[in-house]
């Protein structure tokens, strides 16, 4: 399997192409994109071997096709794919955030000797476009492969072998399970974050302190509300049934805690918070999950001149790079005055060791 065709060369498609081109130079990487400028940029930075201007010619020669396009667009491509001449045992995958709609074409494509294995690389960036592609974007991130028909098991293995150079952590599951679980850990949190921001905005009109005090931890908690609105509108409707069910469950929890507060039931309110803390504290902290995250370290430093410089100098001496640094003005429940964000959990662990003279901890 030498000929890999990418349909769509944004951040995700470009990063996958960049990885395959760098680590597997024997492959021929081709790409088709409605935005011709993206193709020219990809060719100029060397992450593809050739640009495809005729879609039918591209799919005709491909051994594997990777659709890095929005879910609705991918569905249109899959629906029409059997109308084109393709290689025997063609393997097709995508990079979308929901899978039930995509995998609904699985048996239809199998009947045409096309093997569909859905893909969901759980990594991304606030930046977009092929020029922001990074070959290491998927390191230590979960990469979920999805199929519902056992006849696609071998194709899933081949796809995982191809993508092994991404250093992602592969999980195989069904479309239904994927969409429900990502609804719990990703889609609902995005809705909650946006709701909190709307709540803050509404109250800021009569309470000017809201905007000022929301600059600290509140901004971190609601960071994902700054995600692309077009993308999240599409994700919401492509996972509509699961999201509505989960919102009903969430509403029941909110109604329950409201009732306990109204009745001054201190034991139940305590159980609400302690139960959440217990479960959260058991969650892994060294791996990337469904939500894109920064690997933060909190450092307790005295309010003295030169202390921040001292911390950054120590990290620099150990060749540890950081992605952000923030002085916390509002830090209830947070001991450290300095928040340092690292790009990887490994860098954070090295940072903890390098800063052994300071009190550090992870939330």
From Swiss-Prot:
CDD domains reported for this sequence: ACT_PDH-BS
Catalysed reaction equations from the record: prephenate + NAD(+) = 3-(4-hydroxyphenyl)pyruvate + CO2 + NADH
Binding, NAD(+): 3-33
Keywords carried by this UniProt record: Amino-acid biosynthesis, Aromatic amino acid biosynthesis, NAD, Oxidoreductase, Tyrosine biosynthesis
GO molecular function: NAD+ binding; prephenate dehydrogenase (NAD+) activity; prephenate dehydrogenase (NADP+) activity
Pathway listed: Amino-acid biosynthesis; L-tyrosine biosynthesis; (4-hydroxyphenyl)pyruvate from prephenate (NAD(+) route): step 1/1
Limits of the Prephenate/arogenate dehydrogenase domain: 2-291
Domain ACT: 296-363
UniProt-listed Enzyme Commission number(s): 1.3.1.12
Pfam families: PDH_C, PDH_N
Claim: Cell cycle is one of the keywords in the record: no
Gene Ontology biological-process annotations: tyrosine biosynthetic process
Family affiliation: Belongs to the prephenate/arogenate dehydrogenase family.
Protein name: Prephenate dehydrogenase
Protein's gene: tyrA
């Amino acid at each position: 399997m030498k000929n890999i065709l990418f349909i769509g060369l944004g951040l995700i498609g470009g990063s996958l192409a960049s990885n395959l081109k760098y680590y597997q130079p024997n492959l021929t990487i081709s790409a088709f994109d409605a935005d011709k400028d993206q193709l020219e940029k990809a060719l100029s930075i060397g992450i593809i071997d050739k640009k495809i201007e005729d879609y039918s010619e591209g799919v005709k020669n491909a051994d594997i096709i990777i659709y890095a396009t929005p879910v609705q667009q991918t569905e249109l491509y899959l629906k029409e794919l059997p109308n084109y001449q393709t290689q025997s045992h063609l393997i097709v995958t995508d990079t979308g955030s929901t899978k039930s709609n995509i995998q609904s074409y699985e048996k239809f494509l199998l009947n045409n000797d096309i093997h569909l294995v859905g893909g969901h690389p759980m990594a991304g960036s606030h930046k977009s476009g092929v020029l922001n592609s990074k070959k290491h974007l998927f390191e230590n991130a979960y990469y979920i492969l999805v199929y519902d028909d056992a006849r696609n098991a071998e194709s899933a293995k081949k796809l995982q072998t191809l993508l092994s150079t991404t250093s992602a952590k592969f999980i195989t599951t069904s479309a239904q399970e994927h969409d429900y679980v990502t609804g719990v850990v990703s889609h609902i949190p995005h809705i909650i974050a946006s709701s909190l921001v709307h709540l803050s905005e509404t109250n800021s009109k009569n309470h000017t302190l809201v905007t000022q005090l929301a600059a600290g931890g509140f901004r971190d908690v609601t960071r994902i509300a700054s995600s692309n609105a077009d993308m999240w509108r599409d994700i919401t409707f492509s996972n509509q049934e699961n999201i509505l069910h989960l919102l009903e469950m969430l509403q029941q929890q909110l109604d329950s805690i409201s009732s306990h507060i109204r009745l001054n039931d201190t034991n139940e309110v305590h159980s609400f918070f302690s139960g959440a803390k217990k479960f959260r504290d058991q969650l892994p902290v060294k791996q990337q999950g469904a939500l894109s995250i920064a690997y933060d370290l909190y450092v307790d430093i005295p309010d003295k001149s030169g202390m921040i410089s001292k911390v950054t100098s120590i990290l620099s001496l150990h060749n540890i790079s950081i992605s952000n640094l923030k002085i916390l003005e509002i830090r209830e429940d947070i001991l450290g005055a300095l928040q340092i964000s690292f790009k990887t959990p490994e860098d954070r662990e090295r940072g903890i060791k390098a800063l052994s003279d300071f009190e550090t901890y992870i939330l």
